[in-house]
Amino acid sequence: MNQSDILAVNELKILSLDIIDKAGSGNPGICMDMSAVMYTLFAKVLNVYPKIPTFFNRDRVILSSAHISPLYYAMLYMAGYPLNKEELMNFRRLNSSTPGMPELNDPAGVDASTGVAGGGVGVAVGCALARRYLNSLIQKEDEKLNLLNFTTFCFVSDADMMSGASEEAFSFAGVQNIENLIFLYDANQMTAEGSLEQVFHEDLVKKFQNKGFYVDSLKDSENVKEIAKAIEAAKRSKKPALILF
């Protein structure tokens, strides 16, 4: 991991904490846990154009773990999206462009409105399925064309994994083998009420493998190089994927 990556990840952590501190509320845990993952995604992996945030064939990023929003807003700002420092520091304020629960295109770069635990999982599956469907329409004219090649990424947390709505969406993605769909899981083993083991005992690696997912687990969620390798391997798998951090 080179020095510039380390500095960028640390700056992202500090900025997301500043946003939370100014608001007087927010979830710093996931912002610390997933800073390197968020940075790696934007700096090394994503096909996006900050100056044209609605470019149709862009990769999608869905925040099912909506409490990651301070980190995401900080990343949009650092990546050059049309979001200024003043708007960042208005996080969670009435009529601000940086609401606590992400809202579609507010600010630019937010691909879906999310908030309810597990709700973003179905949105992500829908985005990936829509890509397949639109390509099928194009291929009626020329079967060799594969014009839409975007990948949908979805950040999830323990609460998303315990949601009934997400269970149906995950199952559907596996049965339909929806590729170009990658879930990035902050597996910190904690809930708002205490340790995850008090309420949730499932072996998620085996469970998702049985659903037909490609599954990977990284012990070091701060290593940008290893994170990038894991994401690229998931993209090559030709399956829906889950990466645990």
Q: Model-flagged regions — what are they?
A:
Residues 1-153:
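Thiamine diphosphate
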